């Protein structure tokens, strides 16, 4: 039995209600994004990235469009230090990109950090110390006053060393474990730091509010953020930043609600990599904006490339259900879902609307480098006629009649169920050909000749055999060529059925194109049987379709 009494709430509500953010229903503008993949993400890996891998990852982040990138904790290890030096000395930092470095509010660590920054043009120095009740009590064993003093002294040293270096580095402060800190106290510490830095319009300070450990529901975090946003000093000259983690699975919601509550900036990682359950996934937050018509100002147009690079650099695997980027996120196996998607895609093609509204697909997969054939309609034992028909039509140009699509879907489902596997598009096409196209056993036609009679009648001379036996020739009349051939076969083999469906179309747009015909016949018991015929001669194609339908009875 689990001991629920072992736990209690560890967060603190603001001293006054802060719920103005809840009046907003969406994000209207992208925040400033800061990638922490190379620091927070890297330190969470079983095997941290090598210097070479980090350089390549940095280039990838620049390509995606990040303008602020936390590149590490230079005082933590030689690899971290050398990575920053490599970026600076090899001139790998674009002029419009600012690198961010992390340091504890400890003098020797801050000094080593500045040593690592020598020669860097654009940098954010990010200093932090933990302010939560639990850490004050258990880790540091210090009072609120002592913790505030650590923050202020760290802020002073950052300012002093920046002036000595003759640089205009920007400053960032994080009350680490903000979510476990009393909001009034977090505000006091942050305002004391801001008093040291005296931010201006052309040199804003960053106050970062990390949910170092996610402790509450997202609306609580948003209320804490709103309280800070409303009460920070120098607010017009402060960039309010968030650093959500995902311990309760709500990192994305924390970020989104936090933006509504006044945050200007989000720190996170690609695919949510990071300590424990990870940092907030910037891709999800950004794509959530995109699917509502808000430009995330990051380029995710080649998601497969991003996925491959991330897995290569980190050794991590992306969950197939991870929003927007997982291998199965657009996949529809359910028959009803496939049918709705197929109809939605046809509607989009016919109407060409300005906005995307296809059922079950929140965005157009092609916008992020995915494709319909491999990523959307997937066929297994749960699939239906819509999915099978869509694949055969869009990939192979086969426009099956509705009832024939249904018959083909039953065939595909049966095979998938028997084999316990998903069927690829090429397997579905081969299954269609094996089952419904030009089937010549047990009945087979060897030759047909036609003669025009009076009153529009057609006489067919049909040579055929059954189960490889001797060929026999019979004559029969009909209202058309196909009807005459059908009557000949009925006469020869005493067959009973009604010809109830016939359609045809070209498979290619050229004078020598193959044509395909679809024939449906109804047996006395009311069951439909289907066949397709493919031939440059549409008459021959229709005869082959009829014979196949008879053979499929």
What is each stretch, according to the model?
Residues 2-39, 293-475, 511-514:
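A mid-to-C-terminal "edge-of-domain" accessory segment
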């Amino acid at each position: 039995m689990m001991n629920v009494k072992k736990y209690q709430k560890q967060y603190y509500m603001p001293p006054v209600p802060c719920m103005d953010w809840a009046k907003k229903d969406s994000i209207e503008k992208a925040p400033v994004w800061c990638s922490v993949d190379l620091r927070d993400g890297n330190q969470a890996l079983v095997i941290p990235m090598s210097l070479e891998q980090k350089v390549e990852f940095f280039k990838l982040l620049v390509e995606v469009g990040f303008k602020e990138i936390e590149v590490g904790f230079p005082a933590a290890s030689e690899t971290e230090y050398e990575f920053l030096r490599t970026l600076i000395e090899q001139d790998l930092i674009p002029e419009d990109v600012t690198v961010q470095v992390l340091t504890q509010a400890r003098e020797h660590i801050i000094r080593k950090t500045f040593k690592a920054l020598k020669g860097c043009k654009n940098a954010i120095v990010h200093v932090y110390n933990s302010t939560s009740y639990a850490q004050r009590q258990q880790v540091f064993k210090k009072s609120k006053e002592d913790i505030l003093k650590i923050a202020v002294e760290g802020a002073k040293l950052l300012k002093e060393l920046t002036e000595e270096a003759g640089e205009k580095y920007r400053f960032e402060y994080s009350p680490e474990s903000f979510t476990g800190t009393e909001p009034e106290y977090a505000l006091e510490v942050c305002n004391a730091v801001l008093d040291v830095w005296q931010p201006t319009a052309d040199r804003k300070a960053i106050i970062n509010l990390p949910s170092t450990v996610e402790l509450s529901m997202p609306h609580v975090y948003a209320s804490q953020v709103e309280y800070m946003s409303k009460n920070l000093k120098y607010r017009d000259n402060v960039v309010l930043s968030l650093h959500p983690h995902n311990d309760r699975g709500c990192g994305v919601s924390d970020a989104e609600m936090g933006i509504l509550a006044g945050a200007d900036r989000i720190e996170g990682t690609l695919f949510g990599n990071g300590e424990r359950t990870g940092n907030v996934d910037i891709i999800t937050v950004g794509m959530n904006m995109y699917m509502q018509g808000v430009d995330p100002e990051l380029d995710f147009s080649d998601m497969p490339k991003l996925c491959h690079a991330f897995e290569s650099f980190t050794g991590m695997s992306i969950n197939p259900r991870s929003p927007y980027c997982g291998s199965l996120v657009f996949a529809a196996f359910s028959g009803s879902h496939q049918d709705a998607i197929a109809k939605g895609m046809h509607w989009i093609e016919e109407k060409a609307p300005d906005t995307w509204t296809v059922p079950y697909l929140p965005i157009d997969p092609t916008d992020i480098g995915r494709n319909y054939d491999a990523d959307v309609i997937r066929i297994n034992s749960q699939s239906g006629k819509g999915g099978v028909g869509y694949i055969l039509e869009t990939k192979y140009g086969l426009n099956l009649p509705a009832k024939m699509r249904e018959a083909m879907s039953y065939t595909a489902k049966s095979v998938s169920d028997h084999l316990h596997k998903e069927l690829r598009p090429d397997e579905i096409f081969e299954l269609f050909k094996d089952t419904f196209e030009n089937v010549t056993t047990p009945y087979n036609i060897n030759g047909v000749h036609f003669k025009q009679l009076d009153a529009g009648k057609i006489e067919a001379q049909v040579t055929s055999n059954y189960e490889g036996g001797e060929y026999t020739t019979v004559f029969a009349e009909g209202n058309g060529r196909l009807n005459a051939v059908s009557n000949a076969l009925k006469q020869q083999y005493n067959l009973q059925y009604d010809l109830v469906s016939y359609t045809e179309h070209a498979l290619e747009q050229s004078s020598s194109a193959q044509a395909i015909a679809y024939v449906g016949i109804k047996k006395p018991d009311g069951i439909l049987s289907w066949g397709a015929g493919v031939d440059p001669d549409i008459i021959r194609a229709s005869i082959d379709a009829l014979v196949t339908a008879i053979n499929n009875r």
